[in-house]
Swiss-Prot record:
It comes from the Eukaryota. InterPro entries: PSII_PsbI, PSII_PsbI_sf. PSII is composed of 1 copy each of membrane proteins PsbA, PsbB, PsbC, PsbD, PsbE, PsbF, PsbH, PsbI, PsbJ, PsbK, PsbL, PsbM, PsbT, PsbX, PsbY, PsbZ, Psb30/Ycf12, at least 3 peripheral proteins of the oxygen-evolving complex and a large number of cofactors. It forms dimeric complexes. One of the components of the core complex of photosystem II (PSII), required for its stability and/or assembly. PSII is a light-driven water:plastoquinone oxidoreductase that uses light energy to abstract electrons from H(2)O, generating O(2) and a proton gradient subsequently used for ATP formation. It consists of a core antenna complex that captures photons, and an electron transfer chain that converts photonic excitation into a charge separation. It is a single-pass membrane protein. This is Photosystem II reaction center protein I. It is found in: Plastid, Chloroplast thylakoid membrane. The gene is psbI. Keywords: Chloroplast, Membrane, Photosynthesis, Photosystem II, Plastid, Reaction center, Thylakoid, Transmembrane, Transmembrane helix.
Length: 37
């Protein structure tokens, strides 16, 4: 059960990091290169 819990926490943390990274990369304030044109 401990291994399953660690696996679940790892997957959840991974998806949360993906969501945060995607949100920041799509934010114009965080990516000034999209505002050049």
């Amino acid at each position: 059960m401990l291994t399953l819990k660690i696996f679940v926490y790892t997957v959840v943390t991974f998806f949360v990091c993906l969501f945060i990274f995607g949100f920041l990369s799509n934010d114009p304030a965080r990516n000034p290169g999209k505002n050049l044109d």
